[in-house]
A protein has these predicted regions:
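N-terminal capping segment at the start of a domain
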Residues: 21-37, 209
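A structural signal for short, well-ordered beta-strand segments and their strand-loop junctions
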Residues: 40-41, 75, 207
Length: 215
């Protein structure tokens, strides 16, 4: 990726993003079918938005070191759509793993298995000792910056992080919050919108996936 994230500069990447989207979509279907549990609708309908956010350069993050202090933050407000994040990380990490094996270039070297989510980890989705069914900021998913689950749960946290960053003089750090339209029914969502406007949280980006699935 270059520093230019205009549409014209990124257009050549779109074909690869589309292939990545297809891989993530198929993985979501596979792990939910394998486990016979989970939330497919909201997980699949957010794939495009998440990939564009992660790959376009609009969000500053490092897949190898997501805990970097001044990296942008991701809050999955709709925590039940966590298969989206698991499968996205699995695809991107596998690409880096293959690239490192081919080149030996340290830029593609990932941390150990305790910090990296691989294809095989997906088999443990919603199983004891495996990947949990809702978003958790831990271990292999330090990309996430809050533990979420119920509708609207992560909205106040996202706004709080954005406010704290501004008050700490780090207003250049952006907070990206992903939610579905059903999550807007919670009172907390409306309170967050009003608060974000009143507090001028221009570092909070609230991405609403209007999928009409509801769950």
């Amino acid at each position: 990726m270059t520093g230019d994230n205009t549409v014209s500069a990124l257009e050549a990447e779109f074909v690869y993003w589309e292939k990545t989207k297809d891989l993530v979509d198929q993985l979501i279907d596979l792990i939910l079918n394998y486990r016979q549990s989970g939330h497919p609708g909201g997980s699949r309908s957010k794939v495009h938005a998440l990939l564009v956010t992660l790959l376009s350069g609009v969000m500053r993050w490092d897949i190898r070191r997501p805990e970097k202090r001044f990296g942008d933050r991701l809050v999955l407000v709709a925590g039940h759509t966590i298969p989206l994040v698991y499968c996205t990380l699995a695809v991107l990490n596998e690409a880096l793993r293959v690239k490192y094996q081919q080149t030996g270039d340290e830029r593609y070297r990932l941390p150990g298995p305790e910090r990296t989510l691989y294809w095989e980890d997906l088999l443990g989705f919603r199983r004891l000792g495996g990947l949990p069914g809702h978003a958790e900021m831990a271990g292999k998913t330090l990309l996430l910056k809050f533990n979420t689950g119920p509708t609207g749960h992560g909205a106040p946290a996202a706004a709080g992080e954005a406010l704290a960053l501004k008050r700490a003089g780090a207003g250049g750090v952006k907070v990206f919050a992903f939610e579905g339209e059903a999550g807007l029914t919670a009172g907390a969502a409306h309170e967050v919108m009003n608060s974000a406007w009143g507090l001028a949280l221009d570092n909070l980006f609230y991405v609403v996936d209007w999928n009409d699935f509801g769950i």
